[in-house]
Amino acid sequence: MAIDIHNDEKIALFIDGANLYAAARPLCFVIDYKKLLGIFRKRGRFIRGLYYTALVEDQEYSPIRPLVDWLDYNGFTMVTKPTKEFTDSFGRRKVKGDMDIELAIDMMEMAPHLDHIILFSGDGDFRRLVEVVQRKGVKVSVVSTVKSSPPMAADELRRQADQVLAHARRVVAE
């Protein structure tokens, strides 16, 4: 099954980078972002592909930096922010970098200019966002996976979406 996109639809991709990575890793596949962008540029009227990720700023080398730079130079709009470091109640060092608010704000802001949004995330926290965007007349498709354990695509998000591609390998894998 593929996502149904009409030729006249204005479309945008919203990629929750951490969630997509977490879905792909246990399934042992690498995401071909060039192919992914190419697929959607050929369908509908492609407006933008946004990729959301937090970056560890204080490290000499960040393992995600080469990907971020490649995406930035190859057609994606990068939305990043620095991670925050804190110590939990057990004295363990933790790093936090949630991009959900940034993604939600951008989606709400762009929704009036789009016909179809493709959300690459299985995060159930986005269910209400999807509902509100749909009320604005925008179709929302979700790409994630139910093949992982536990499934990365939350049930409530799958139920809310207009279309679900729960076997993300068909769209994003090499």
Residue positions per predicted region:
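Domain-level signal for Mg2+-assisted phosphodiester chemistry and nucleotide/NA-binding surfaces
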Residues: 1-99, 124, 139, 145-149
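Residues that line or immediately flank small-molecule/substrate-binding pockets and catalytic motifs
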Residues: 53, 121, 168
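Residue-level recognition of hydrophobic positions within alpha-helical transmembrane segments
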Residues: 96-98, 102, 121, 158
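Conserved interaction-surface patches within small, structured recognition/assembly domains
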Residues: 101-117
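Structural recognition of alpha->loop->beta junctions
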Residues: 104-108, 151-174
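Active-site histidine-anchored catalytic micro-motif
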Residues: 112-155, 159
